[in-house]
Regions:
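NTP-dependent small-molecule kinase module
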Residues: 2-10, 31, 35, 144-194
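P-loop (Walker A) phosphate-binding loop of NTP-binding proteins
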Residues: 20
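Walker A/P-loop
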Residues: 26
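Short glycine-rich anion-binding loops that position phosphate/pyrophosphate groups of nucleotides
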Residues: 90-93, 113-115, 163-164
Length: 194
């Protein structure tokens, strides 16, 4: 993100996690939020709660376009909450409107290797984009497509491959930008949890 864009926007008071599926966004997000004493939101889980059905069912019934519309609507709501940690869906940053919404917070990309993602998802049958015979190839394709977008959107990144989630959170908390966000929130700029 360009410095001039950040200067024009209000200083962030929330942390948004982006990255590939199974990169650790939910696990690390929960630990980070608990450590900060902030609410944690996972965009996909919030969509499931509101709709009453699994993401895979939404993909089946409404297609990817229907899911993406729900995702953008949920992101618009969650990115407006100050003092929150929000885990975004892996494909969310691929859309202009969602990239604009991400400018409301400090964006951290969680990076993981193909082999780690493959290992973490090997028994997972709920991810619509991995319902293919060659999962490793599909993950590589998604990384090639999404990686440059993640990098362009992120304010910072952390490698999560083979890393202990608590250590990853320690690295995030050590970022000067995160310390500044924490100070702003502690000074009273936090909203109410949902």
């Amino acid at each position: 993100m360009q410095d001039t864009e950040r200067k024009e926007a209000a200083l962030p008071t929330s942390i948004f996690l982006i990255g590939m599926m199974a990169s650790g966004k939910s696990t690390i997000g929960k630990i980070l939020a608990r450590t900060l004493g902030w609410p944690f939101f996972d965009v996909d889980r919030e969509i499931e709660k509101r709709s009453g059905v699994a993401i895979s069912t939404i993909f089946e019934l409404e297609g990817e376009a229907g899911f993406r519309a729900r995702e953008t609507q949920m992101m618009a709501e969650l990115t407006a909450k100050p003092g929150a940690v929000v885990a975004m869906g892996g494909g969310a940053p691929m859309f202009d409107i969602n990239r604009t919404l991400l400018k409301r917070g400090f964006v951290i990309e969680l990076r993981s290797s193909v082999s780690d993602i493959l290992e973490r998802t090997r028994r997972d049958t709920t991810r619509p984009l991995l319902q293919t015979e060659d999962r490793a190839r599909r993950i590589r394709e998604l990384l090639l497509e999404r990686g440059p977008v993640y990098t362009s959107v992120a304010d910072a990144f952390v490698v999560t491959s083979r890393a202990n989630p608590e250590r990853v959170v320690e690295r995030i908390l050590a970022m000067p930008e995160v310390a500044a966000i924490r100070a702003r929130v502690d000074a009273g700029q936090r909203g109410e949890p949902a």
